[in-house]
Amino acid sequence: VFIFDVHSTYQTDEVFPGYSYHENAEDFAMLWDTYEDVAPHSIVHELTFFVKEEDGSFSRHDEVHEERTYEVLTYDILLEQAGFKSFKLYADFEDKEPTETSTRWFFVAQK
């Protein structure tokens, strides 16, 4: 059994582009902005963290995360090429089938 999860194409194409989340606390701040990337179903997350140090100053930490997902058919083909005979597909952290607006897909593949 091989179990994995990925963002859905709805998540990368409709939800993430333009997504912005900012959090500000006394000892910590985070900026998270997401942009559409060039490849189909791909996005770039730009994250900036400000962490308060013991001396009261703040240090800055930047991260860039690039993510891409594919259509379910592509995962089906790749799983078959890897020797898997079948898979079940679930969505959004629940025991349910995906819908058009599901944001996360969970694959349970069998050899």
Model-based region annotation:
Residues V1-F4, F87:
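A contiguous, well-structured "functional interface" segment within a domain
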Residues I3, H7-T74:
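SAM-dependent methyltransferase
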Residues E66-K111:
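C-terminal lobe and adjacent flexible extensions of AdoMet/dcAdoMet transferase-like proteins
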